[in-house]
């Protein structure tokens, strides 16, 4: 996820304002920063690195002009380098663009432009935009028409801001499936990816909708892509700056849970990449997942998928244990290493050990990380930066990649079901108020248990991990059938047991386990289909989910209420769920 800012001031220098605005987007995560101003010549300063580091080297505020654009980049296409940092320009340097999103057909557009003589300087998808605008302006269009024509040629998501020295004093912005707001000041205007960037300058904003453009030139005009004027309402924001960074949510974790439907949609755009990687890998006889923590739980789901749908024997090994139990890897084994950061020390060491013995694939979120450079094959989750320490949206994005991998390797029917997952998630999020009320009644317990069978077992493990990470309550996840082999001794009056039981072949046996714990005084919190009257009857509390979610895709949807439950229990206990004690986002030591 990137952040873009633009401003057109009535007086004063734009560069210091842009620098201050992009600093307020640091929370989104980034690896590069850049600013372009127009006076009317376009001048650019940009580099990879933290804002303070780049500013110390380049003095980003020292650029002339009362208008400009700025960007903080989270790499998706091309490594974090000065060349790949935004803004990007056309051949002549007369047009500059900043962009948030992913252009899916950029390679074919780039090839077409190169055949016409355009020269590219970066590896990014974004650079096709200024070159397309240049092409259409050379044909006689103005900046507004050229930008609209360029965007109609592109597939994917975008929020952009464009300037041209051929039309000084004008900024054009547009959006599709990526947020862009307009800030309305006193005789001056702003564009931004998010409210916090501009709150120091105005609290009056216009929210652009998909397929809309805005033209700033001393005045403000919003149009559709055909140039028809669109009337927009100006909203007043009463958030504090801190709340605005979190999009109005109290914590990043809650914001990121609510971003999960869009995170899955973004991950699904990688389907062509998955198909390409599967073709490169070729035939495999065995799968071996290697991961830690939440990524390990995603791997367990992968084991159930590969074995039940494709019949491929699959192992799941903790990265920290890999050196002791790697087994017989060979050139017909696909070893899959999962890491949000791509820098997890245990996972990297396991990857290095496996590279000479098996086919290796890294599933990561951070472009250019060590895992992406060292694995033979790479797939990206495209979840964007995740600020909360406890993994939420990156978990469902990892799962989505695994499901796509299984689909590409022989179960294509999965894709139709995956396409509906964001819709199911959105319905699950609608029940947050009920989950918040539930959390208030069980925030003072000392133990919590999560049980499930089959595909629900990894969900039980992940639910327990989330709870103990951010609430500091002892939580354990168990295969429901294992209760009688020891854990049942820990069940006592009032102990919460979360029973995860989606529709499917494991449902009836899980219900028997629910009866076991009820007989020993447990407080049962049932999580199942909203139409599951048998589970509802046995449970003290019940969380109902869409009845079309079966056991196979349940890990993607049933985790949502468990994340919400953990979050609200943490808040009830007066804790900060974004920063749990003793934990770090990226574990770079063994």
Swiss-Prot record:
Catalyzes the first step in hexosamine metabolism, converting fructose-6P into glucosamine-6P using glutamine as a nitrogen source. Its EC number is 2.6.1.16. It is an enzyme of class 2 (transferase). It holds the Pfam family SIS. The lineage of its organism: Archaea, Methanobacteriati, Methanobacteriota, Methanomada group, Methanobacteria. Residues 277-415, 438-580 form the SIS domain. This is Glutamine--fructose-6-phosphate aminotransferase [isomerizing]. SUPFAM superfamilies: N-terminal nucleophile aminohydrolases (Ntn hydrolases), SIS domain. Keywords: Aminotransferase, Cytoplasm, Glutamine amidotransferase, Repeat, Transferase. The gene is glmS. It catalyses: D-fructose 6-phosphate + L-glutamine = D-glucosamine 6-phosphate + L-glutamate. It is found in: Cytoplasm. One of its GO terms (biological process) is carbohydrate metabolic process.
């Amino acid at each position: 996820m990137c952040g873009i800012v633009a401003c057109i001031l009535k007086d004063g220098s734009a560069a210091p304002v842009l620098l201050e605005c992009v600093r307020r987007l640091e929370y989104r995560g980034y690896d590069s920063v850049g600013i372009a101003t127009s006076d009317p010549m376009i001048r650019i300063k940009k580099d990879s690195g933290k804002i303070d580091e780049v500013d110390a080297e380049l003095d980003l505020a020292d650029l002339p002009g009362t208008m400009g654009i700025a960007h903080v980049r989270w790499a998706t296409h091309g490594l974090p380098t000065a060349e790949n940092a935004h803004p990007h320009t056309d051949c002549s340097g007369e047009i500059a663009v900043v962009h948030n999103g992913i252009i899916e057909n950029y390679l074919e557009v780039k090839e077409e432009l190169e055949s016409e003589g355009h020269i590219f300087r970066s590896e990014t998808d974004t650079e096709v935009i200024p070159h397309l605008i240049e092409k259409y302006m050379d044909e006689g269009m103005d900046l507004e028409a050229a930008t609209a024509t360029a965007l109609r040629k592109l597939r994917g998501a975008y929020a952009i801001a464009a300037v041209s020295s051929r039309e000084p004093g004008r900024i054009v912005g547009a959006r599709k499936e990526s947020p862009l707001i307009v800030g309305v000041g006193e005789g001056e205007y702003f564009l931004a990816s998010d409210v916090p960037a501009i709150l120091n300058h105005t609290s009056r904003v216009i929210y652009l909708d998909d397929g809309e453009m805005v033209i700033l030139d001393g005045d403000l005009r919003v149009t559709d892509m055909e140039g028809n004027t669109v009337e927009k309402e100006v909203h007043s924001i009463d958030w504090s700056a801190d709340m605005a960074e979190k999009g109005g949510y109290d914590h990043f974790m809650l914001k990121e849970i609510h971003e999960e439907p869009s995170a899955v949609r973004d991950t699904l755009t990688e389907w062509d990449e998955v198909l390409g990687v599967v073709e490169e890998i070729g035939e495999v006889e065995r799968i071996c997942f290697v991961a830690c923590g939440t990524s390990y739980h995603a791997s367990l789901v992968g084991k159930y998928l590969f074995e039940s749908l494709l019949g491929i024997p699959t192992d799941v090994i903790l990265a920290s244990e890999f050196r002791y139990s790697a087994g017989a890897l060979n050139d017909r084994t696909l070893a899959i290493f999962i890491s949000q950061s791509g820098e997890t020390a245990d996972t990297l060491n396991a990857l290095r050990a496996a590279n000479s013995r098996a086919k290796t694939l890294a599933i990561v979120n951070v472009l250019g990380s060590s895992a992406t450079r060292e694995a033979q094959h790479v797939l990206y989750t495209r979840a964007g930066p995740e600020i909360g320490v406890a993994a939420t949206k990156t978990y469902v994005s990892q799962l989505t990649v695994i499901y796509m991998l299984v689909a590409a390797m022989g179960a294509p029917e999965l894709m139709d079901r995956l396409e509906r997952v964001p819709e199911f998630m959105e319905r699950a999020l609608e029940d947050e108020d009920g989950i918040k009320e539930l959390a208030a009644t069980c925030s003072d317990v000392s133990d919590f248990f999560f049980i499930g069978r089959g595909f629900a077992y990894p969900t039980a493990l992940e639910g327990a991990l989330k709870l103990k990470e951010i609430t500091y309550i002892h939580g354990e996840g168990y295969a429901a059938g294992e209760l009688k082999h020891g854990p049942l001794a820990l069940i006592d009056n009032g102990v919460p047991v979360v029973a995860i039981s989606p529709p499917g072949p494991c449902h009836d046996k899980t219900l028997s386990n629910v009866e076991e714990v009820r007989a020993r005084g447990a407080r049962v919190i049932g999580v199942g289909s909203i139409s599951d009257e048998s589970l509802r009857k046995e449970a003290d509390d019940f969380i109902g989910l869409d009845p079309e979610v079966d056991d196979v895709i349940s890990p993607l949807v049933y985790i949502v209420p468990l994340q919400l439950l953990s979050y609200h229990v943490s808040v009830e206990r007066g804790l900060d769920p974004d920063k749990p004690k003793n934990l770090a986002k990226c574990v770079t030591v063994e």
